[in-house]
Amino acid sequence: MEFLSKYTACLSNWGLNLEPGLQTVGAAVLLTTGSLFIASRVLTFVRVLLSLFVLPGKPLRSFGPKGSWAVVTGASDGLGKEFSLQLARAGFNIVLVSRTASKLTTLAEEITTKHSVQTKTLAMDFAANDDADYEELKAIVNGLDVAVLINNVGKSHDIPTPFALTPEDEMTDIVTINCLGTLRTTQLIIPGMMQRKRGLVLTMGSFGGLLPTPLLATYSGSKAFLQQWSTSLGSELEPYGITVELVQAYLITSAMSKVRRTSATIPDPRAFVKAVLSKIGRNGGSPGYAYSSSPYWSHGLMAWFLTCVMQPMGKLVVGQNKSMHEAIRKRALRKAEREKGKKST
């Protein structure tokens, strides 16, 4: 809308200030420019629709033969658990990495019971950033044909909180888990992929990395970092035949999002992971972001609108995002007060 108003004003000025012959030329130039701009937006939207609803992604078997392995971080719950189950169903052996050993054991048993694949587990707290943990992970994957890496481990704020009030340990954990944990794991896995000239490195991003998110500033910044890092990595590894993809996601029902009810815009992990794995290599709703995708249909449409129509870094979008998270914070604080009152009675 802002473009059209500027376009109209510019056209009016040309009409006022130029000779009649030049007015015609000027109007034609502006009309052509405007038409090309609108046509490019329409074509981009058509590409988005084709990517989301028609065109298939790369087959998972293109990343590794039967008997190859997938490493999944944050594997014990939510998206990580679902990635593990669906990759096992596709015939991959699974290395499960997460913090809680008992949950990993239960999931490993579920996978081997349902599917004829092998599993390995590692109970690892990414917040600790312990060299010994990474050495143990290296020992586990050494000699394995790791075809797929799912960087799913992540942490957000307990509730939306102004940066000045964010607890230091929460801030440190978010950066250590989301950024450093992802980098160290990836750097450990990709040499084998580079040797074999194939592989998939898939990292879970967030709309928080696309849109500055007040009251989730540290989390938003960590996901923006992953966006830039993953896109750069995609360019570096493409000559080795490795597909790198950052998945831009809106809300999904999970412990992290604290959303329990599904809707058109909030899928459950099963539906979301199915969309991700069926659209590898397709941009979905993120045509302007190389080596990135927003593959779930409603998330893709939102991502297209926010990045191709709106100005994601503009004050309007940031202000709306701030208002939304201020309201969420107020509700969370009221709920905490009610629960505190119940405990004291």
UniProtKB/Swiss-Prot annotation:
Q: What class of enzyme is it?
A: oxidoreductase
Q: How does it sit in the membrane?
A: Single-pass membrane protein
GO terms for MF: ketoreductase activity; very-long-chain 3-oxoacyl-CoA reductase activity
> What this chain does, per the record?
Component of the microsomal membrane bound fatty acid elongation system, which produces the 26-carbon very long-chain fatty acids (VLCFA) from palmitate. Catalyzes the reduction of the 3-ketoacyl-CoA intermediate that is formed in each cycle of fatty acid elongation. VLCFAs serve as precursors for ceramide and sphingolipids.
Native organism is Neosartorya fischeri (strain ATCC 1020 / DSM 3700 / CBS 544.65 / FGSC A1164 / JCM 1740 / NRRL 181 / WB 181)
The catalytic residues are 219 (proton donor), 223 (lowers pka of active site tyr)
Q: Where does NADP(+) bind?
A: 71, 125, 133, 152, 219, 223, 252, 254
Query: What is this protein called in UniProt?
Result: Very-long-chain 3-oxoacyl-CoA reductase
Chain ranges passing through the membrane: 26-46
Q: Does the keyword Methyltransferase apply?
A: no
- EC number(s) reported in the record: 1.1.1.330
Family in the record: Belongs to the short-chain dehydrogenases/reductases (SDR) family.
Q: Which reaction does it catalyse?
A: a very-long-chain (3R)-3-hydroxyacyl-CoA + NADP(+) = a very-long-chain 3-oxoacyl-CoA + NADPH + H(+)
Where's it mainly located? endoplasmic reticulum
Q: Which domain of life is it from?
A: Eukaryota
